[in-house]
Amino acid sequence: MAPFVAIALLVLLSLSGLEAIQHAPKIQVYSRHPAENGKPNFLNCYVSGFHPSDIEVDLLKNGKKIEKVEHSDLSFSKDWSFYLLYYTEFTPNEKDEYACRVSHVTFSTPKTVKWDRNM
């Protein structure tokens, strides 16, 4: 029984150490289809490689939060880092600017990544 207790203790200690690990998210902003002015599309913000899991993601239009946004379930990779996809339907045009704003413990201030329609 003593070996079992020792192994259980080691597992618990290693799991508690995961909370101390912090990885900044990688942020990718892209449209589902190539951008065409006046043609409906989907704006995606893929946030990956972050730890811990607490994160706030907003899609922005001209600097203002878009309210009707959906997202995937929080998932994790083999290395225990997390990833999410936030998306919304939008119709691009020449004047509007779109971006993704992410708040995470690894950032001192929220990070905003603009959508590049040519990507």
Curated annotation (Swiss-Prot):
Biological function: Component of the class I major histocompatibility complex (MHC). Involved in the presentation of peptide antigens to the immune system.
Subunit composition and interactions: Heterodimer of an alpha chain and a beta chain. Beta-2-microglobulin is the beta-chain of major histocompatibility complex class I molecules.
GO BP annotation list: antigen processing and presentation of peptide antigen via MHC class I; immune response
Disulfide pairings: C45-C100
Record's signal peptide: 1-20
PROSITE patterns assigned: IG_LIKE, IG_MHC
Keyword Hydrolase in annotation: no
Domain Ig-like C1-type: 25-114
Gene3D superfamilies: Immunoglobulins
Name of the molecule in the record: Beta-2-microglobulin
One Pfam family in the UniProt entry: C1-set
Similarity remark: Belongs to the beta-2-microglobulin family.
Main localization (coarse): secreted
This protein's record includes keyword Signal: yes
Gene: B2M
Protein keywords: Disulfide bond, Immunity, Immunoglobulin domain, MHC I, Secreted, Signal
Compartments (UniProt record): Secreted
GO CC terms in record: extracellular region; MHC class I protein complex
